[in-house]
Amino acid sequence: MGKNELVKIFVKNSNSDISIIEGVMGYYDGFDGKTNHASTHHVAALLKAPVILILDASKTSRSIAATALGFTKFHKNSRISGIILNKIGSKKHETLCRHALENLNIPIIGVIPKNSGNILESRHLGLIPVTDQKELQKKLNQVSKNIGDYLDFEKIIKICKNVNHLPKIKPQKFKKAKTSVAIALDSSFNFYYHDNIEALRREGARIKFFSPISDKKIPNCDCIYIGGGFPEILGKRLSQNNTMKKSIKQAAENGTSIYAECGGLMYLTKSIKYQNKKYKMIGLFDAETEMTKKMTLNYTDGRITSYCLISSPRNFHAHEFHYSKIINIPKDTKFLYDLNIGEGISSKKDGFSEYNVVASYCHLYFDSAKFASNIIKNSGT
């Protein structure tokens, strides 16, 4: 998305005294193994943000200093301002690690014991969504108590006070709402960039939410947006809601535009096979989905090769993250995306298209191009 867009997003969403950016994967892991591009370190550098590094200290003592030294010296400006030691086994273990780190001049701002418990549950794509967490407030209260016991907030606040002020951004202008966009949102589909939904609103979308699990049919709309999620977990309930599946398929056949990503793509195939059970889905595309144990996780780089709902031909960046594969694809299938980096649906090809529908494994950030504008423009009014 570029530096300017990144700064704009951060400033727009920073409405607190302290804003926390969660890193993903390893600190220096990014687009490839050659540079820091698109890594957590790269983001921190662009935002001029200090970094608190969390290190797994289990099964180590003095060697933790070698790990910390490697992270701080790997790049000439690591931006690392403090360390949290995770999975500490005992007071003696903590003392050994502290002694090892004494000469690095990096503040230790927290020590978390290994038996502190996994309070927030996870599944194959990460933390279980808020909508599926039981007794969430009780769990958050426990997390809050643990944080108070384990972290030195005075040191954290001191680090945060050294942050450079970022530029102010102009309020965004919103076009008059003229196109209704129905967004699937429930326990089966809830992986959305909030900025994508805001981008649609900015371009003139009137947003309606619906549940593919509970509602009988889609609301009256010009466009349907089905994001990622866990359709395999809710496969039985999705398959049993025949009126919803029928309404989506008929809408597509009648010209309603549909944009679907990952879980949405799976929902539009004929079936999803999960734990040796096959669940019948919408069948808009003549292919099937099968869950696997193999993780697909990539930044993607590719090209949209044909005019479609979201774009004219152009290059794009995105990401893919799933444990599924699309099978029984007809040999004459034409794909919308050619990928230079990434797996896609099949052999670096991604993007099914039928009627005014686009469905792929790629998760797009709409403001990286005019995707939201094109969706509104190419949807009926």
Q: Positions of the model-derived regions?
A:
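ATP-dependent carboxylate-amine ligase catalytic core
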Residues: 1-47, 51, 55-81, 91-95
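Structural motif
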Residues: 20-22, 52-54, 56-57, 84, 86-89, 184-187, 225-227, 361-364, ...
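Phosphate-binding active sites in nucleotide-utilizing proteins
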Residues: 177-253
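Internal gly/pro-rich beta-alpha loop/helix module
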Residues: 61-172
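C-terminal and late-domain segments of enzyme folds
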Residues: 44, 149-153, 174-177, 189-199, ...
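Cysteine-nucleophile active-site neighborhood
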Residues: 207, 230-308
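Hydrophobic/aromatic ligand-binding patch that stacks against planar heteroaromatic rings
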Residues: 42-43, 100, 199, 250
